[in-house]
């Protein structure tokens, strides 16, 4: 009886963790999605948005060669997984009054994939 219960518990736990790898973020898919972002976020000095190379772990409004909005300057964020996720999903909710003219990306998996891609930018 105890062996049977332990076996069932092991199978249940194994099933729970079987899909974990399948849910991992996909940087290559994130790169495909980033094409829309690249319309503004480029390495050109006259770009509409700031350069996102090295954005992961960087403080918000940290690039000296980009003119950030006052709300972004006051945001005092560090671009980690949580802050990037919130901002990509709904920029105005995360930093009210920022200038990014983007409504947000609603699919959570797509957001995670974009973040995985941003982590590759150095």
Can you say where each PLM-predicted feature lies in the sequence?
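Bacterial N-terminal signal peptides that target proteins for export
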Residues: 1-11
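N-terminal signal peptide c-region/cleavage motif recognized by signal peptidases
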Residues: 19-20, 25
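Periplasmic/extracellular electron-transfer cofactor-ligation site
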Residues: 25-67, 73-78, 89-98, 120-122
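Alpha-helix N-capping/helix-start residues
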Residues: 27, 81, 107-108
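Short, exposed beta-strand-loop hairpins at the edges of beta-sheets
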Residues: 103-107, 113-120
């Amino acid at each position: 009886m105890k062996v049977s219960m332990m076996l069932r518990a092991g199978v249940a736990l194994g099933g729970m963790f079987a899909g974990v790898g399948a849910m991992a973020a996909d940087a290559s898919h994130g790169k495909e999605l980033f094409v829309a972002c690249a319309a503004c976020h480029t390495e050109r000095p006259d770009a509409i948005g700031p350069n996102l190379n090295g954005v992961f772990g960087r403080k918000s409004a940290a690039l000296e060669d980009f003119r950030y909005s006052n709300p972004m300057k006051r945001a005092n964020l560090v671009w980690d997984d949580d802050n990037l996720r919130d901002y990509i999903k709904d920029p105005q909710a995360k930093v009210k009054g920022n200038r990014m003219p983007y409504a947000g990306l609603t699919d959570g998996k797509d957001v995670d994939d974009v973040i995985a891609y941003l982590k590759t930018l150095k």
